Structure formats: structure tokens, C-alpha cells
Amino acid sequence: TPSDLFRDWEDRFYIADSGNNRIVVTDSGFSKATRIYDKLKTADGETTLKDPEGIYVSEETQCMYIADTGNSRLLVCDLDGNVQLELTRPDSTLYENETFKPQKVVVDKAGNIYMVLNNITNGSAMFNSDGEFQGYFGANSVDATAEVVANYFWNMIATDEMRANSSRNVA
């Protein structure tokens, strides 16, 4: 089952095929698979993917970034399938969740890695190019003030007409 798709600078498509535990590379017309990554080389042998849900390929680093969801990790591999870096659950006070399930991944030109993680609402988890957890990027928390709670309650009981006539306050 395809769960993500990435088009590279040479018009190749990388497909995260989560149902078959692999990354499939096709030509620009999707007419043939030019490469299948189902086993990746590690320093001590090889590893397999399990339910990969995200793929990103960087022209700058010539690496694939694979959200290997079922194995609770993100793999950084060269285009020959050699694992360069493995990111797992951060050992940080900022990361409070028990699980680490990367679903989608992107990388900026500086090499920073941004991951959407299952059950994380703090934003995208950000790692530097060395794999060190930097915190979250994107979402800010909303303090549950009396006004926020009152607005939430009001929206639960208000009719569509009442909501249409009300104004929205953004601080």
C-alpha cells in the first residue's frame, strides 16, 4: 500500500510502499520500477523496513530519509542503500511521549530534519543534521484561559446562525 510519494530532481518517483515494507523507485511515467529498497545495509549487516510511511530524498546530501514507522525510527541512507544514520526516540526532557512513530519527513537545505510523528501535537519534531533532537517546529500550545474555555463551551451549544453572527478573536 503506497503511503507517500517523492519526486526527485531527475523525475524519478520514490514510493513508500508500507504494505510491502519497501521503497520503490520508478521512472517518471511509473512504467517500471528502477530500484527496490527492501533491505538496507548497516555497519553490522543489514536491516529491513517495516511499514514505512514517509520518504524524502535530498539532492544536497544525495540521501534518502525514510520514516520507518513500524520499526519506530527514521533512517538516513545513501542512494546505494547504505544506512548513514538512524534516529530513534529522543532522550530529552522536551520529548515526553513514550512512542516514536515517524510518519512523514522533510529536510531543509541546512540538513535539519523535520518529522511528523504519530500522537505528537507539539508540531514537527526537529533534528539537526547529526541527528540531535532540537525540539519542535510549528505548533504552539494554547493556554486554557477562562476565555478559551468559555468560547469552546459557547461553540458547543451555539446554532449555526449564532456562530455566523459572532466574531472571532485572535490574540
Spans of features found by a protein language model:
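Eukaryotic scaffold repeat domains enriched in small/polar residues
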Residues: T1-A171
